[in-house]
Amino acid sequence: MKIAYFDTEIDPTSHKVLDIGCILEGGRTFHSHSIPGFVDILKGVTFICGHNILLHDLKFIHQSVTAAGIQLSNAIDTLYWSPLLFPNEPYHALLKDDKLQTEDNNNPLNDAMKARDLFHDEVASFLRLKEDFKRIFWLLLHDQKEFAAFFSCIGYNCAKTETEAIIRQNFHPYICQNADLQRIIGAYPIELAYSLALIACNNRNSITPPWVSKNFHAVESILFQLRGKPCLTGCAYCDRSLDAEQGLKDFFNFDAYRTYEGQPLQKKAVEAALRNKSILAVFPTGGGKSITFQVPALMSGQNVKGL
């Protein structure tokens, strides 16, 4: 199954194709502005692959791709897979937000080679995932245009099963048991996949890449629904990770908040913040106001990357 990795340089005003770089899996290269030459090297290719090609390159050269006999549904975009497979900070060395790290900004052949290297790393990373995590990604993403070609190319599929059940089974200690997962799965499968990847990496310094937040706005809301909103009945996750006293212990190693005239004002203020509620609490000078801001902020940073 042949794959062509490519990148283009496009005039931002005229949208004219200024340069094209392409490398086949076997090593044959193409570097020219010639559209007929690009079509020629693509003949016999099954999949095309590049970085940010769905939002950028294919807008300008999609006719060349189809002229070579390649279905546009067979376009693999490494951009969308990167936050799923490299969520840990520091991130993949070839990435800088939605761009490839490159020494030469005007050499599409060099960027095509970088896209090839990144794709190979993504495939290797996917294959190293636990089987249940592979299944979760497939169940959420196999019919999404940004992800379907990747699964087809590597030949991965699995039996359809209850998506909510397998997510709850694997993320039981890390998300609220009363979150409306079924609604999120139906409405925001891509955003949920990005959220789960970030949760699973368990690295407080890892964040959602800016381009993901820009293009998939619901990620922030989903993280909040899964990990930042205490449920009314309580559950294993909320009782541990959204508990005001546990947060005080975790971050400051204090066992209890101060009380004032018998009132636990600090604790009430922190609990109100954790529940996104308003409260008016009047503290004496030096009465520990700062900790009522710090504890919920630090807990938000840890739970939903909200700091």
What are these regions (language model features)?
Residues 186-243:
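Interdomain "pre-motor" coupling segment immediately N-terminal to P-loop NTPase/helicase cores
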Residues 282-287, 291-307:
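Conserved SF1/SF2 helicase motif Ia
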Residues 18-24:
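Short beta-strand scaffold segments in enzyme catalytic cores
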Residues 94-178, 182, 186:
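Acidic, Mg2+-coordinating catalytic module of metal-dependent nucleases/exonucleases
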Residues 24-92, 99-126:
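Conserved DEDDh/DEDDy metal-dependent 3′-5′ exonuclease domain
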